[in-house]
A protein has these predicted regions:
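PLP-dependent class I/II
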Residues: 1-140
Length: 140
């Protein structure tokens, strides 16, 4: 590349973002994450496991066979028999239990027949949600 020094310098900066790999701050963040302490990561993983166990185990205890999720902060649950589409079931969950889930159909045709829960709330709130579903009579 031939030209004014300031233009060449700007082109070099731009080029690093086009075809020479990841943005430098992203690389530095990745290095920090991979070389930093593991305790915060382990603690967060343990918290997601507690939330997953509260949701999936709670639903199984009331008769809804929801498999454990592994490696994700989301749980995919089959729509129980007799509740129509994933969208219809989500509406029933909101109206009858006050619990929000996402219809699987939002993710394309392969998602139909499932609903998705996010493990973003504390265990206490998840336990309350399971109890609300139980009290609603939707399952069983």
């Amino acid at each position: 590349l031939v030209g004014r020094r300031d233009v060449i310098a700007a082109c070099k900066k731009l080029r690093t973002q086009i075809d020479f790999g990841k943005f430098i701050p992203e690389q530095k963040a990745a290095i920090a994450a991979m070389t930093g302490p593991l305790e915060p990561i382990k603690a967060q993983c343990a918290e997601y496991q507690r939330r997953r166990d509260a949701l999936c185990g709670g639903f199984r205890s009331i008769g809804w066979d929801v498999p454990d999720s592994h490696g994700s902060m989301f749980v995919w649950a089959p729509v129980p028999q007799g509740h129509g589409t994933s969208m219809e079931f989500c509406m029933e969950m909101i109206e009858k239990a006050g619990v929000i889930c996402t219809p699987g159909s939002s993710f394309g045709p392969s998602g139909e027949g499932y609903v998705r829960f996010a493990l973003t709330l504390p265990v206490k709130k998840i336990t309350e949600a399971v109890q609300a579903v139980k009290n609603s009579g939707l399952i069983g």
